[in-house]
Amino acid sequence: MQKQWWHKATIYQIYPRSFKDTSGNGIGDLKGITSQLDYLQKLGITAIWLSPVYQSPMDDNGYDISDYEAIAEVFGNMDDMDDLLAAANERGIKIIMDLVVNHTSDEHAWFVEARENPNSPERDYYIWRDEPNNLMSIFSGSAWELDEASGQYYLHLFSKKQPDLNWENAHVRQKIYDMMNFWIAKGIGGFRMDVIDLIGKIPDSEITGNGPRLHDYLKEMNQATFGNHDVMTVGETWGATPEIARQYSRPENKELSMVFQFEHVGLQHKPNAPKWDYAEELDVPALKTIFSKWQTELKLGEGWNSLFWNNHDLPRVLSIWGNDSIYREKSAKALAILLHLMRGTPYIYQGEEIGMTNYPFKDLTEVDDIESLNYAKEAMENGVPAARVMSSIRKVGRDNARTPMQWSKDTHAGFSEAQETWLPVNPNYQEINVADALANQDSIFYTYQQLIALRKDQDWLVEADYHLLPTADKVFAYQRQFGEETYVIVVNVSDQEQVFAKDLAGAEVVITNTDVDKVLETKHLQPWDAFCVKLSV
């Protein structure tokens, strides 16, 4: 396998609205990110994935783009973007841009022209039909919106302000490739591709994900844009199996560097239920099965995976699967150790490295997220009690990840000097903040720093094979074999003591959140114990 820089990289996702505000308007901005690069350099990350900062009416917080080659005023301007790129590159940090090309904003010049002039070339940049079919929007309701002026319907798999692009139109594809090359020329390190598995859709057959021409489009995109540059690409692919992931990321296929697979995320809700019908606790045996499948079936050289617990669309893993009260620090370290010692490129979402938690939303006035608000409206119309709706939003709503970054004990957690922030700051910022984390050598931050450094330094993390070890249900233990070297990772994914009887005598500790000798002596794991050891030959 040809080694690439991203095999040893750890990537840090920034949600710009919530990272750091320097303008005093209560919303994070590009200058705020630049001001905190030294912090990220200390953490040790290789690259930042930047959620969208393009010009946008912000119907879906920037995932509705009205101009791909301009910066949203709320975040700054192109000079600020250039400054961020230069300052990051000086520190050896790459910037990965979010590429949102399944749809645009309805305020994009192409759609404005398409709507105003049904005979324009731009009309065919989007998907119009005389009659709607049964396709549903991911944000609830029909995926078709009537344009009263022409009497036709346009397709929007997300909000009605996010019309889907017609990827069958070669002119659209070329315009997208030109835009991608504009950003590559600026020196970015790659693209994270939003819902990229939807671009091959065939609406008339009600096929949305993994359409028949999807891989043709990606091969064409690769050749026309990033294929000749040392940049990384990761596709958001909700429906991916290991077999599909191989198609995307097998090097000789010349498509993407890696994918995000979301199979484990499905464990956040009850089987075959919507996300709002959340599971009360993590099914650890199911998690073991899913992670082990991806570790063993996406073989080295055949494709590449990403590793993540959190992103801007998901609740905080600490609150949904960890223990965000008495074992907050320990369970955060345990979940990090469990994930980061697998094969793949790990992604950290802002605040994860200090153990940020879900927000205690009281009522809908505190909620901003379009998906949560649509769910609340629909659920309450169907008789779901308001208390149950709020319980679901508190547990799995997207705003949990989007509350402002907690920098210090200062007002608004040091995020902003505004009177009010765009989303409320979690009241636990007095206990959970960057300043305290940096001052405490035993904090979650330093466990993440250690894991990031290990990945840069240790070839086995990239190349060793993976084998799940038989254990109690709530213990996740796996072994990685690299030539003569054997590494064993053991994590108690529970609040209860667990038996662990494997003989690891004489093993060398690589990383831990507990007293490994005591575990091996007593053959018991305390709640959320986690460690990695190298076995003696």
Swiss-Prot record:
The active site is at 194 (nucleophile), 236 (proton donor). The physiological substrates may be short isomaltosaccharides. Coiled coil: none annotated. InterPro entries: DUF3459 (IPR022567), Glyco_hydro_13_cat_dom (IPR006047), Glyco_hydro_b (IPR013780), Glycoside_hydrolase_SF (IPR017853), O16G_dom_2 (IPR045857). It catalyses: Hydrolysis of (1->6)-alpha-D-glucosidic linkages in (1->6)-alpha-D-glucans and derived oligosaccharides. One of its GO terms (biological process) is oligosaccharide catabolic process. The record marks 313 as: Transition state stabilizer. Its main location: cytoplasm. The keyword Ion transport does not apply. Keywords: Cytoplasm, Glycosidase, Hydrolase. It is an enzyme of class 3 (hydrolase). It is found in: Cytoplasm. This is Glucan 1,6-alpha-glucosidase. SMART domains: Aamy (SM00642). Pfam families: Alpha-amylase (PF00128), DUF3459 (PF11941). Belongs to the glycosyl hydrolase 13 family. Its EC number is 3.2.1.70. GO terms for cellular component: cytoplasm. The gene is dexB. Gene3D superfamilies: Glycosidases, Golgi alpha-mannosidase II, Oligo-1,6-glucosidase, Domain 2. GO terms for molecular function: alpha-amylase activity; glucan 1,6-alpha-glucosidase activity.
